[in-house]
Amino acid sequence: NAMLSIYSTYPNSSVLSIKTIPISPMYCSAIGKAALAYYDDEKLAAYFKRQDLRKRTAKTIITREAFEKERERIRESGLAYDDEEYEEGLFCMAAPLFNAEGAVVACISVSGGYGRMMAKKEKVAEVLRQAKEFIEVYTESMDRFEL
């Protein structure tokens, strides 16, 4: 029902930061939506049936119908967005990581202030896609897990 981030870096810091970040609901976080987009229909229906969908901001998607449109866009582009859905002023972009069998096993994401991310959206998307490809190609043990 939720996604847990366990690693973060900050570009203007010389200190490597490893920590857990508050658990965010899947339906309103980029990493959660990246994973949900690849659930089969039965698993997705079960998620929406049991999940309490609360509006966190004016932009939060809270219906299965609205998510289905988002799901199609995610599958076409390969990227999921949190466009101020979890927190106002925050924009996140995520890509699912697949194992050899085609199952989503993890997600990677980039987050930042809305204005800053919008100014570099295409560049960030390209770098995120490159990182996704690198991780999938060079990670052999991912086939042991599935979200």
Model-derived segments and spans:
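Sensor-regulatory modules in signal-transduction proteins
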Residues: L97-A100
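Short, solvent-exposed recognition segments
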Residues: S17-E85
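Amphipathic coiled-coil signal-relay and dimerization helices
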Residues: M3-T9, S14-K19
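Juxtadomain coupling helices with adjacent low-complexity linkers
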Residues: E88, V105-L147
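Short hydrophobic beta-strand micro-motif common in sensory/regulatory domains
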Residues: F91-A95
